[in-house]
């Protein structure tokens, strides 16, 4: 997990550069979206974050009811390696840095670029499938693809990048909490 943590810490600034360049182009073409934070928005964000975490739990429970986890050597290996480190590294990595890095890449860059080429719905589906594929085993593919669809949808509906980031952090934290 320490290697993953360091890798994400190094990767985030690189992906952030691409995200910011794309964002500057979008702001120039479509105009800059103003950030307004109200109590209503805070409630909506809280409900959204809890909903994403609940979806993560639901998808994990559905997958657990099948024989996929036992049948997937790739998942077993990845899970053992992922949760083999110290708890502080697991928390910082899986609950904070990894969601930020993945959201920058998959919703911030991949989804936004696919949306320009394909439109909203195909971009949501394609970016979610790509997000699932990079998780490299069937169990995590299913979980990540479902979560990826929801996160891209939330990003599209709200227009604010922090919404899928907070949702992803909540989902990973809830899953991580189950392993601690």
Model-derived segments and spans:
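Hydrophobic alpha-helical transmembrane segments
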Residues: 2, 42-50, 88, 92, ...
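Juxtamembrane helix-loop-helix connectors linking adjacent transmembrane helices
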Residues: 27-104, 112, 116
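Active-site His/Glu-centered metal-binding helix of metallohydrolases
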Residues: 100, 104-105, 109-110, 137, ...
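Functionally important transmembrane alpha-helices
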Residues: 128, 140-177
């Amino acid at each position: 997990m320490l290697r993953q943590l360091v890798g994400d810490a190094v990767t985030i600034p690189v992906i952030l550069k691409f995200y910011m360049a794309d964002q500057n182009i979008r702001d120039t073409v479509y105009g800059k979206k103003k950030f307004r934070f109200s109590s209503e928005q805070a409630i909506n964000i809280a409900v959204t974050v809890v909903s994403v975490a609940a979806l993560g739990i639901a998808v994990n429970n559905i997958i657990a009811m099948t024989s996929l986890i036992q049948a997937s050597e790739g998942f077993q290996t990845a899970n053992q390696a992922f949760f083999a480190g110290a708890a502080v590294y697991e928390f910082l990595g899986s609950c904070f840095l990894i969601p930020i890095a993945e959201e920058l890449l998959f919703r911030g860059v991949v989804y936004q670029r696919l949306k320009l080429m394909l439109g909203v719905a195909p971009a949501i589906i394609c970016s979610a499938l790509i997000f699932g594929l990079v998780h490299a085993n069937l169990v995590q593919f299913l979980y990540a693809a479902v979560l990826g669809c929801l996160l891209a949808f939330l990003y599209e509906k709200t227009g604010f990048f922090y919404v899928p980031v907070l949702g992803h952090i909540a989902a990973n934290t809830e899953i991580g909490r189950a392993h601690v």
